[in-house]
Amino acid sequence: MVKFYDKEFGSRLLIGSALYPSASIMQDSIRDSGAEIVTVSLRRETAGGKVGDVFWSLIQKLGVTVLPNTAGCRSVREAVTTAKMARELFATSWIKLEVIADNDTLQPDVVGLVEAATILIKDGFEVFPYCTEDLSVAQRLVDAGCQVIMPWAAPIGSARGIVNRDALKLLRDRLPDITLVVDAGLGAPSHAAEAMELGFDAVLLNTAIAKAEHPAVMAAAFKLAIEGGRLGYEAGLMGPRDFASPSTPVIGTPFWHAVS
């Protein structure tokens, strides 16, 4: 089980609802992923009438927990306003907080992120902040009251996998009581397994699934990879070594194999 604030879930895969070729493929992908939490964009919901209504109806039929986000927001004021609108629309205090600094890299504005998180937490929100892998930023978010931290593995949609493994491992080591979710930059099931092997609590995926040739199949693949990676972490992974170590004991080796 993984805990997000006061709620527990069986699946460690969170999934986004954007970029799918069709609504039916989105539904199939969410189902096959086993995800219990789906992120949705307020901008999509308010963009226009019937399209938004149909989309929301499809999400509701899946019986999942909705995590609205502030995707596309580029200022503290915009992010806070969007979060408040999302709380009214979706009737939840959860918000995936994004404050973007650069249009090309979609890198988080970490200064604005901490400021927005502080404002929202004081207003009763339970914040899921999308941030870089910088420990000092993560610590400031924790100090502000965030119980969940969502660092990127690489830039959004890049499919590069974990770029700074050491920094992510440091986050896990230094924030043992915080729920850590790798968010953005993963492209293959093996990337997700690696994140879980580092001890992260969950993974959020969207582009890697939605843009796959067969999204629903890819969703199932990520599900299995995340389960395998977590199980490996819980089993206690053997650390790397600089030299070979025989798996067969040398005791009892025949004399003719002995080194003179």
UniProtKB/Swiss-Prot annotation:
Catalysed reaction, written as an equation: [ThiS sulfur-carrier protein]-C-terminal-Gly-aminoethanethioate + 2-iminoacetate + 1-deoxy-D-xylulose 5-phosphate = [ThiS sulfur-carrier protein]-C-terminal Gly-Gly + 2-[(2R,5Z)-2-carboxy-4-methylthiazol-5(2H)-ylidene]ethyl phosphate + 2 H2O + H(+)
Known EC number: 2.8.1.10
Cited Pfam families: ThiG
List of residues binding 1-deoxy-D-xylulose 5-phosphate: 157, 184-185, 206-207
Gene3D superfamilies given in the database record: Aldolase class I
Active site (record annotation): 96 (schiff-base intermediate with dxp)
Keyword field: Cytoplasm, Schiff base, Thiamine biosynthesis, Transferase
Subunit structure of this chain's protein: Homotetramer. Forms heterodimers with either ThiH or ThiS.
Family that this chain belongs to: Belongs to the ThiG family.
Record protein name field: Thiazole synthase
